[in-house]
């Protein structure tokens, strides 16, 4: 099994480590300073307070003739189309897009070819410290496993094989029917959370700001109530908790989560490092919400 990780940030590096540990033939494609570090030191990561080096091949360029069983595209939303263009002529058949985006999957297929895209989203978080060492982890299964689906919503040989490699790598996963709806609901949650950090005077201690926590709770209730009304369902179903929890309880839960080690690793670190991406996703998400609202009024 040959796997290419396109993108050597936190998410790409962690999946490369996990696949390499499993024994898969794993390569990771990097650029710039990250490439320089990896070429010199290898893919270093922290595990049980020890520093280890993953048995992964470091690539600074790609050949169209290099065929992989799976390519995992782990880049930011604003890097997506450049990456797809570079992979357009690659011989590999399956590109797993682990990207925050509300774009139509057809636009992606128009670039790389129909049937090659497997939309997905990672269940992981963490950071790469100033020494270039990965300190990351998978999110607990009950919170957010690696999620994916065929564009059609049907099961396929692609989803079967991807499930198999995730299972062998001990990576929690779930298959859904409508990946676009899942990503829309995901953004309904993470956009207000990121906004809270950006609005706080001290982002690292945003959970201490009761006013911001209450505002964030209101945004979450509003987002999910609107989506439920528009789509008739939420994905996954557990997102309905944001609709039903009383505002005071949700505010307290948010404050506790923001101040926890979980909040630091899986929420704060990403919001801090990907502020440009999250601000752009904020614009896209609320523009999409406005579009849905206007379409509903036209029907009425």
Which role does the model predict for each range below?
Residues 164, 212-237:
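Flavin-binding catalytic cores
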Residues 180-207, 211-224:
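Active-site-proximal catalytic alpha-helix in oxidoreductases
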Residues 50-135:
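Rossmann-like NAD(P)(H) cofactor-binding subdomain of soluble oxidoreductases
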Residues 3, 25-26, 95, 117, ...:
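Hydrophobic anchor at the start of a short beta-strand
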Residues 1-53:
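NAD(P)+-binding Rossmann beta1-loop-alpha1 motif at the extreme N-terminus of oxidoreductases
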Residues 228-300:
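NAD(P)-dependent Rossmann-like dehydrogenase/reductase catalytic/cofactor-binding core
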Residues 135-149, 198-208, 261-272:
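Helix-loop-beta segment of a Rossmann-like dinucleotide-binding subdomain
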Residues 106-182:
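Rossmann-fold dinucleotide-binding core
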């Amino acid at each position: 099994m040959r796997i290419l990780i396109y993108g050597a940030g936190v998410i790409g590096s962690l999946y490369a480590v996990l696949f390499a540990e499993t024994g898969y033939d794993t390569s990771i494609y990097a650029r710039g300073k990250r490439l320089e570090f990896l070429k010199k030191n290898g893919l270093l990561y922290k595990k049980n307070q020890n520093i280890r080096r993953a048995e992964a091949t470091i690539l600074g360029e790609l050949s169209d003739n290099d065929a992989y069983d799976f390519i995992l595209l782990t880049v930011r939303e604003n890097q997506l189309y450049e990456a797809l263009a570079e992979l357009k002529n690659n011989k590999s058949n399956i590109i797993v897009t682990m990207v925050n985006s509300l774009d139509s999957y057809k636009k992606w297929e128009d670039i790389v070819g129909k049937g090659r895209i497997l939309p997905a989203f990672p269940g992981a978080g963490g950071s790469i410290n100033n020494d270039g060492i990965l300190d990351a982890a998978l999110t607990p299964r009950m919170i957010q496993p690696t999620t994916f689906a065929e564009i059609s919503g049907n099961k396929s040989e692609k989803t079967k094989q991807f499930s198999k490699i995730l299972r062998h790598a001990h990576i929690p996963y779930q298959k859904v029917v409508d990946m676009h709806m899942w990503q829309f609901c995901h953004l309904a949650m993470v956009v207000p959370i990121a906004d809270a950090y950006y609005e706080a005077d001290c982002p690292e201690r945003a959970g201490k700001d009761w006013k911001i926590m209450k505002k964030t709770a209101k945004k979450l209730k509003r987002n999910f109530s609107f989506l439920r009304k528009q789509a008739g369902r939420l994905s996954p179903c557990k997102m309905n908790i944001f609709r039903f929890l009383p505002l005071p309880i949700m505010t307290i839960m948010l404050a506790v989560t923001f101040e926890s080690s979980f909040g630091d690793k899986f929420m704060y670190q990403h919001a801090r490092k990907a502020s440009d991406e999250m601000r752009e996703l904020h614009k896209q998400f609320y523009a999409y919400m406005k579009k849905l609202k206007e379409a509903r009024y036209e029907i009425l």
